[in-house]
């Protein structure tokens, strides 16, 4: 049923687009050209010149005494474009069915073969607890680049479990992950002279085998779960988990490479920790509770 709705939406969008074209610009197609036209379920879309910034603040408040909280604010987010691949390599949104199980909503990233689609991100962060406000500084991501992969969401297979079940596949490069505890400064520069203190992790590469996206969670064979739980003692918390893998091939393998880790400080001096590499990673099970 959902697939039929998506088809109807796509047809409606196509008809609306045709309605804006003058009749004089339409040309008949030969049989050979028509034979090459094929349809697909789902919706394809892309971005062009995307950028946003402003005083938006996201806050997670704990139910514990005093309601301590963690916040992110003053967001900046932008994306560069691969102009030649805007329509040939889009994001894809699809809904598909599984035998005897709930339907899945799947969002697939562009393949980004040329590596031109890159994200820039910055946000301030802090913690409020015990009547004290701590401003942690600014988190900066430079040249965040996705190559394929994507996110799938559905309902948990166990009807007694509430929340969102998900699958996640990633092949991602990050030019620089930077934490500046004193001031944001110029977020487009990795190491400006005016910044006296920062942590910089550069050249982060995460992928699966053969440089393909790493299936950290699979919506059917190794689903992740994100939900809110209240235990028998009345304590509430956010829960993030990934189940055991049910595939006969076991959990997929990934790899992580970091080109350099550097601490910069005008007080204690600079410390260069060099590079790091984990050749093979298998995520068998994950259970994280946020209090």
Feature annotation, model-predicted:
Residues 1-44:
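Low-complexity repetitive segments in secreted/extracellular proteins
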Residues 44-291:
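Intrinsically disordered, low-complexity polar regions and short flexible loop motifs
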């Amino acid at each position: 049923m959902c697939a039929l709705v998506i088809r109807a939406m796509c047809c409606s969008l196509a008809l609306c687009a045709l309605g804006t074209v003058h009749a004089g610009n339409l040309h008949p197609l030969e049989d050979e050209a028509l034979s090459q036209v094929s349809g697909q379920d789902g919706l394809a879309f892309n971005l062009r010149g995307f950028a946003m910034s402003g005083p938006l603040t996201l806050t997670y408040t704990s139910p514990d005494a005093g309601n301590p909280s963690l916040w992110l604010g003053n967001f900046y987010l932008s994306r560069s474009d691969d102009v030649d691949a805007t329509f040939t390599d889009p994001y894809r949104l699809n809904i598909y069915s599984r035998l005897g199980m709930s339907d899945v909503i799947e969002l697939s990233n562009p393949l980004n073969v040329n590596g031109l689609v890159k994200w820039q991100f910055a946000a301030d962060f802090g913690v409020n607890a015990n009547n004290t406000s701590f401003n942690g500084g600014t988190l900066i991501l430079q040249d965040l680049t996705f190559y394929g992969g994507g996110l799938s969401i559905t309902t948990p297979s166990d009807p007694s479990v509430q929340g969102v079940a998900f699958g996640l596949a990633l092949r991602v490069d990050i030019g620089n992950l930077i934490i500046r505890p004193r001031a944001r400064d110029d977020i487009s520069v990795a190491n400006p002279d005016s910044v006296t203190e920062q942590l910089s992790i550069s050249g982060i590469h995460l992928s699966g085998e053969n440089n393909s996206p790493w299936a950290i969670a699979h919506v059917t064979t190794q689903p992740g779960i994100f939900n809110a739980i209240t235990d028998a003692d009345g304590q509430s918390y956010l829960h993030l988990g990934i189940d055991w893998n049910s595939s006969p091939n076991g959990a997929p393998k990934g790899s992580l490479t970091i080109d350099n880790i550097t601490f910069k400080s005008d007080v204690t001096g600079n410390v260069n920790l060099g590079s790091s590499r984990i050749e093979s990673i298998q995520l068998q099970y994950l259970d994280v509770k946020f209090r």
